[in-house]
Amino acid sequence: MRLGVNIDHIATVREARKTYEPDPVKGAIIARDAGADQITFHLREDRRHIQDSDVEKLRAVITEIPLNMEMAATEEMKQIAIRIKPDRVTIVPEKREEITTEGGLDVVSMTDYLREFIKELKDNGINVATFVDPVEEQIKASMEVGADAVEIHTGEYANARSDKERDNEIFRIKKAAVYGRSLGLKVFAGHGLTYTNVQPVAEIEEIEELNIGHSIIANAIFLGLDEAVRKMKKLINEVRRKDIRV
């Protein structure tokens, strides 16, 4: 199983003072060298953390492992992606007032628009995933609009308050992952995953990649980023020994 390390919150700390450090690009290099299988970042429309200059630098230095750009389905972001050429674009919903992404993309309501949007990205050599809730209707629509993969939103699982709720959410995620694979899609997962809740998701064999950011960066304050990445990789590998490549 691959681990994508999201570096957004390194930039969040930097932007708290509108200064030059910590540098998310340096963080990406450390994460890569610690065993990250992918670097993920979200260039938001409001530029609250990652900046355009970061994106340019990330593309220049992250060449040995995939670079995954999370973005809203806007014309501005599409043109940036076509110019930068990340290895993958993950299309996410975005609201300016939200603290973090609050749910999955409603692909069903945007099929005509997304079909053309995704085609242009793929015509420029970029793989495309949609970030969706564990709902078969959204996964099927993702396949129909031409996505190569779905990333299943694990936020409801992460926010579950009881063992029963967590078990129910794991069942939903597992069912969605099986369905996605049956349609020929690659299946990833992420959002709200931590050192204490990651393993039940990592055990789902249909999921081949997890994207994790906040928990790793939060622990890096105390452990250092290198050790924080290695610790997460170790937890995943304890339940998933199979190494799946793009």
Curated annotation (Swiss-Prot):
Which Gene Ontology BP terms does the record give?
pyridoxine biosynthetic process
Q: Which residues does the record give as 3-amino-2-oxopropyl phosphate binding sites?
A: N6, R17, G192, G213, H214
Listed under catalytic activity are: 3-amino-2-oxopropyl phosphate + 1-deoxy-D-xylulose 5-phosphate = pyridoxine 5'-phosphate + phosphate + 2 H2O + H(+)
The record's InterPro entries line, in alphabetical order, gives: Aldolase_TIM (IPR013785), PyrdxlP_synth_PdxJ (IPR004569), Pyridoxine-5'_phos_synth (IPR036130)
* SS bond list: none
Q: In which pathway does it act?
A: Cofactor biosynthesis; pyridoxine 5'-phosphate biosynthesis; pyridoxine 5'-phosphate from D-erythrose 4-phosphate: step 5/5
Q: What is its main location?
A: cytoplasm
GO CC aspect terms: cytosol
**Organism superkingdom:** Bacteria
Residues annotated as binding 1-deoxy-D-xylulose 5-phosphate: D8, H9, R44, H49, T100
- Please name the GO terms that the record assigns under molecular function: pyridoxine 5'-phosphate synthase activity
Alphabetized UniProt keyword annotations = Cytoplasm, Pyridoxine biosynthesis, Transferase
Q: Where does it live in the cell?
A: Cytoplasm
Q: Where is this site: Transition state stabilizer?
A: E151
The record's EC number reads 2.6.99.2
Where is the catalytic site?
H42 (proton acceptor), E70 (proton acceptor), H191 (proton donor)
Oligomeric and partner information: Homooctamer; tetramer of dimers.
What does the UniProt function comment say about this protein?
Catalyzes the complicated ring closure reaction between the two acyclic compounds 1-deoxy-D-xylulose-5-phosphate (DXP) and 3-amino-2-oxopropyl phosphate (1-amino-acetone-3-phosphate or AAP) to form pyridoxine 5'-phosphate (PNP) and inorganic phosphate.
Family membership noted in the UniProt record: Belongs to the PNP synthase family.
By what name is this protein known?
A: Pyridoxine 5'-phosphate synthase
Species this protein is from:
Persephonella marina (strain DSM 14350 / EX-H1)
| Gene that this polypeptide is encoded by | pdxJ
